[in-house]
Amino acid sequence: MTRSVENRPDWDHYFMEIAEVVSKRATCLRRGVGAVIVKNKQILATGYNGTPKGMPHCAEVGCLREQLNVPSGKCHELCRGIHAEQNAVVQAAVHGVSVDGATLYCTNQPCVVCSKILINAGIRRIVYRDPYPDKLAEEMLAASGMQVERLDFAEQELSLIHI
């Protein structure tokens, strides 16, 4: 069987598909999110949303946000979990890997808390798949000069179906 070069995913779709696989490790009951930090077409770190290392997962003890009736997008601190983007930056730091100038691929648009961390970590470009409307995050990212793009999978998926 011969594959056509035309059917290969471009780099953005390639790394976003990896972020999708990473999201399958998420332990959040509300939403599974995956993140991949890339520089020069090399993966530097990955992260998914879930509780901190060594702590019980929400699937085991329940969702604190649901228990407290916290609406989506509000009071991010009222959660046992850490976001995928935060986890990816932490993993890079733990292993002594600079993410300055890198691109973050994330299955969801970053919230304001993650946006601030990404700006300070030196991430220069964010590519996301699913929107997560957060006006303050969008304003901060724009003011920082961050390049932010939503990746459209529809066109790419059509070409990949015929492999």
Q: Model-flagged regions — what are they?
A:
Residues 1-160:
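Zinc-dependent deaminase catalytic domain
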